[in-house]
């Protein structure tokens, strides 16, 4: 397991990255589809920040966590940092596909760190954004 901490001068944690155990990385590289699904969730409890997650899917459509990271916010810089750390763990994967929502930071990170990977958007996120747009136009 790789653990990487980045701190400010004042000692506050601004970023943390955890690459899950070697077994999961080996499973992803050897046995799973070359597909990574990436998303983030905002932490709203005592510890604020953004939890970034990268998962893969096995042949039985089971979700396998590959890496997780926590940063102060969901920005292009934090996504590039997360993707670079992910690439350190998995290396260059041929025919890699990355699925995410349409966050500009993820798109920028995919283009910068995995330029040869196919980057697609999650249909569920596209549908929810369309429904939200329709509700706003009715109001």
Segments (PLM) and residue ranges:
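DNA-binding interface regions
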Residues: 1-139
């Amino acid at each position: 397991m790789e653990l990487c901490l980045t701190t400010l001068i004042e000692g506050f944690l601004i970023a943390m990255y955890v690459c899950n155990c070697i077994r999961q990385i080996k499973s992803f590289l050897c046995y799973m589809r070359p597909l990574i699904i990436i998303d983030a969730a905002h932490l709203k409890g005592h510890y604020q920040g953004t939890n970034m997650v990268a998962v893969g899917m096995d042949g039985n459509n089971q979700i396998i966590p590959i890496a997780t990271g926590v940063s102060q916010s969901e920005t292009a810089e934090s996504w590039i940092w997360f993707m670079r750390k992910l690439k350190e763990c998995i290396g260059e994967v041929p025919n890699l596909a990355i699925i995410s929502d349409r966050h500009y930071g993820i798109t920028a990170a995919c283009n910068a760190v995995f330029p040869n990977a196919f980057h697609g958007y999650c249909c569920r996120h596209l549908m929810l954004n369309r429904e939200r747009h329709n509700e706003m136009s009715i109001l």
